[in-house]
Design a protein with these regions (language model features):
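Juxtamembrane intracellular "pre-TM" segments in multi-pass secondary transporters
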Residues: 2-38, 70-75
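Extracytoplasmic gate region of multi-pass secondary transporters
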Residues: 30-97, 152-160, 164, 189
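Conserved glycine-rich helix-kink/hinge and helix-boundary motifs of the Major Facilitator Superfamily
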Residues: 39, 79, 83, 119, ...
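Transmembrane alpha-helical cores of Major Facilitator Superfamily
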Residues: 43, 83, 87, 146, ...
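Interfacial helix-cap and linker-helix signal at transmembrane-aqueous boundaries
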Residues: 60-61, 99-100, 104, 192-201
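A membrane-interface helix-boundary motif in multi-pass transporters
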Residues: 75, 113-116, 194-207
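A late C-terminal transmembrane helix in Major Facilitator Superfamily
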Residues: 93, 167-200
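C-terminal transmembrane helical hairpin of 12-TM major facilitator-type secondary transporters
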Residues: 111-158
């Protein structure tokens, strides 16, 4: 069936207007301190994340004399020590966004919520990482790893979505740029961690 003139007119009138994609103001981005903070936060978060992804199994399996947990790779305990923190990480990432939204709906300003969840997330992670370095109980280490992942998940409601607050029209580009900076940490952190382990044979320095 062919469209009638009235239908064609309706389609043209209701069609979304064409807007040219705005150019990215790179110079302004470099000078924009909030965006620089997002990029730094992404870099730091990825540094710890990819260090754990790369070396957590090795840490759990490493002999106690070398600062590891001494858990056999084929044991169920090893799977437990690796799996539980990962599950907690997934759940906390989802809940972190809901937490930030809930605080904003309660009347807290967006900027205070973003700063608050970032502060809790990063300072909390730093504290629990420090505690792991002196812990020799597997259960306590797993609990601390879970708490670290909870703190990292809380940050999902902070720098993880802050791009949309700074420039709604440039959200995709901002995420791409900060994500690219974060991937530099993803490349470097396993290399640095491996080098430090080879030189010092100490896990406490890694944490």
């Amino acid at each position: 069936k062919n469209l009638s003139p009235q239908e064609l007119k309706l389609i043209k009138n209701e069609a979304p207007s064409k807007e040219s994609a705005p150019s990215i103001p790179f110079l302004k981005l470099i000078k924009n301190m909030p965006f620089v903070a997002i990029a730094v936060a992404t870099f730091c978060n990825n540094w710890s994340l990819y260090t754990f992804l790369s070396y957590l199994p090795k840490y759990v399996n490493a002999p106690i004399t070398e600062g590891g947990m001494g858990i056999d790779l084929s044991s169920n305990i090893f799977v437990f020590a690796i799996l539980i923190p990962c599950v907690v990480s997934i759940v906390s990432l989802i809940m972190g966004g809901y937490l930030a939204d809930a605080l904003i709906k309660k009347g807290y300003s967006v900027i205070n919520v973003r700063k608050g969840v970032n502060s809790v997330g990063f300072f909390g992670s730093a504290l629990f990482l420090f505690l792991i370095s002196s812990e020799d109980s597997l259960l306590n280490v797993v609990i601390l790893l879970c708490l670290i992942n909870v703190c990292s998940g809380i940050c999902a409601g902070g720098f993880g979505v802050n791009h949309a607050d700074l420039g709604p029209k440039y959200t995709g580009s901002l995420v791409g740029i900060s994500g690219s900076i974060g991937m530099i940490a993803a490349i470097l952190s396993p290399i640095v961690a491996g080098t430090v382990l080879q030189i010092t044979n100490s896990w406490s320095i890694i944490f």
